[in-house]
Amino acid sequence: MKSEIIESLKSKLNRRVWESWFGTFDVKEIGPDYVVFQVGNLFIREWLEKKYGSLISKTLRELFGKPMDFRIEHASAKTEEKLDSNEDEPLVKKRPLILTPLNPILTFENFVVGPNNMFAYSTCLEVAKNPGKYNPLFLHGGVGLGKTHLLQAIGHYLFKHEPDMRVIYLTSERFLNELVDSIKKNRVQEFRDKFRNKIDVLLLDDVQFLIGKTGIQTELFHTFNELYNEGKQIVVCSDRDPQQLEKFQDRLVSRFQMGVVTKIEKPDEETCFKIAQKMAQLENAELQEDILKLISKNFSDNLRRLRGALVKLIMYQQISGEKVDLQKAFELLAIQNSYHNKSLPEEKLMNSICEIFGVSQEEILSKSRKKEVALARQIGMYVARNYMGFSLRKVADMFKRSHPTVSHTIQKLEELTNSGNMVIKSQIDRLARCVTGQILDQSV
């Protein structure tokens, strides 16, 4: 019956979740009306009880045909110490110790590499493949640019490829809370032993949280020294460069700078578009390419905001049963409401085209192929479609052109802007700024 329980649970979970959280999960005992499970440590036990308790209960009821009680036990510290000290026993593999849950999506495979993060990505991958080679690694950059993704990716890689290596991933807030808790319970030595003697890799996120907290900085300093002197890998993430960590002990800042310091920059529009594509793919969502471009143009400053925008559109599609078009995306994401103003946005666009390019509305709507007229018309179509959210049919009607002509024109301008034609890009931006009140194309 043990194997049936395991297989039934496994079939209800995706592979990443199973490997991340159920790697040490096993059936210890089956009674007449209860089942006892065992996992590797307390944190995993608490996480499984909280997140998957109802699923476990439902699975047991299905298999036994009646309600079953269950409890999850974890290997005690004493048991682990006994196993470690018993030389006659076969070697017991030490699974990575994950204090804060790893997001199963945040792997190297799912990280989109661009010019802004190439060095950071390559360094983190090298650290994962060869722990201790670049030590310490200090990764910094603005909020929502992928630091945590890379940090957790290291954890996932080690969990998969180095099962004997003891890895701790946690936030600096968690590190502080653990210390405070150990002080309250008079177990500071246990805390120190855990972080200095029982791990091989420390992955510490959001170290800027410790700014101004002298006591915990001192503890981190000594922990850092112990790990470093033993050749154990340390990776630290922050939203700022080590030198910008105000109210941080100088000796600790100097430790951060001993190894490799690398920064993640803001992604360019092309990388943002690829990120939006990857996120949509991971969510199994179908969104038009122009919608993904809209999101990448307007949320490139913070990838968490970008994902939030994407999820909002996906949820709308799921709840309403309707496919989101470009104009609906503008509305749902509240991007520059001014061009959804009821006071004839078409008229505002046409007037702006005439004013900026020095042509008349009659020329724009005519069959004239004069270079200056054709260019003004084409840029007007592009802005109407990509910046104002008009449908292709609406753009075709407005400029008195066929649907295929409009589609071809927009594709042609897209190719020109992607190839780096700054003249065209600046003209598009000027018109877009005039009709929307903001510059949406940040790459200009």
Swiss-Prot record:
GO terms for biological process: DNA replication initiation; regulation of DNA replication. Gene3D superfamilies: 1.10.1750.10, 1.10.8.60, 3.30.300.180, P-loop containing nucleotide triphosphate hydrolases (3.40.50.300). Residues 101-317 are annotated as: Domain III, AAA+ region. Keywords: ATP-binding, Cytoplasm, DNA replication, DNA-binding, Lipid-binding, Nucleotide-binding. It is found in: Cytoplasm. Residues 318-444 are annotated as: Domain IV, binds dsDNA. Residues 1-66 are annotated as: Domain I, interacts with DnaA modulators. One of its GO terms (cellular component) is cytoplasm. It comes from the Bacteria. Belongs to the DnaA family. NCBIfam families: DnaA. Domain I is involved in oligomerization and binding regulators, domain II is flexibile and of varying length in different bacteria, domain III forms the AAA+ region, while domain IV binds dsDNA. This is Chromosomal replication initiator protein DnaA. It comes from Pseudothermotoga lettingae (strain ATCC BAA-301 / DSM 14385 / NBRC 107922 / TMO).
